[in-house]
């Protein structure tokens, strides 16, 4: 898959984040063996599978939790990924429970959060709302002595195929800089 191709292309394993729904046991085992930067967890079932594999391999694995911020990106229904009706990611309440119940698990280290609200997004407002929600969640975790090292901000800026209006890169960057000033974590962009 993509992970193997990325490594074959010469990308350093400590720069690779493995994301996406439907990761197989074999893919997860390969990612854990390769000591990549982090695996973004989509569900509680996937978390349990990762723990089982890391226990078998006797390796501690770095994880990020993919948060579904319940933000409508106002894009085509087939490419939106950030509302509660979408199958992607964990709601904030579930993520809080995972931190409470799994943060001291010897097989994993939860060091990141991830969001991805959709593709072909042509308005900055959904990003602003999603980034605000994830920032508030990180601040809440920090108050509980949970430190987030990596924040993976996903979602696709709309491409101009004809004369469609889209988001300016400078506007997007301004919002990310605002987050990075408020939080003490690495910002990862996909």
Annotate each language-model stretch with its function:
Residues 1-150, 175:
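Active-site-proximal beta-alpha core segment in soluble small-molecule metabolic enzymes
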Residues 71-75, 149-164, 188-189:
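Flexible glycine/acidic-rich beta-alpha junction loops that bind and position SAM and/or redox cofactors
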Residues 158-189:
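Anionic-ligand-binding alpha/beta catalytic cores of soluble enzymes and soluble regulatory domains
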């Amino acid at each position: 898959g993509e992970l193997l191709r990325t490594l074959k292309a010469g990308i350093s394993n400590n720069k690779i984040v493995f994301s996406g729904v439907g990761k197989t046991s074999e893919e997860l085992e390969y990612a854990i063996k390769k000591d990549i930067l982090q695996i973004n967890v989509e569900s509680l079932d996937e978390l349990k599978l990762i723990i089982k594999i890391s226990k078998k391999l006797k390796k501690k694995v770095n994880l990020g939790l993919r948060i579904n911020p319940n933000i409508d990106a106002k894009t085509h229904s087939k490419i939106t990924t950030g509302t509660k009706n979408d199958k992607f990611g964990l709601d904030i309440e579930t993520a809080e429970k995972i931190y409470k119940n799994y943060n001291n698990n010897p097989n994993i280290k939860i060091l990141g959060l991830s969001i991805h609200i959709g593709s072909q997004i042509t308005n900055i407002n959904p990003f602003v709302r999603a980034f605000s929600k994830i920032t508030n969640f990180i601040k809440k975790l920090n108050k509980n002595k949970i430190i987030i090292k990596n924040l993976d901000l996903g979602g696709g800026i709309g491409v101009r195929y004809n004369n469609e209006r889209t988001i300016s890169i400078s506007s997007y960057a301004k919002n990310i800089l605002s987050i990075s000033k408020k939080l003490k974590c690495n910002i990862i962009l996909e």
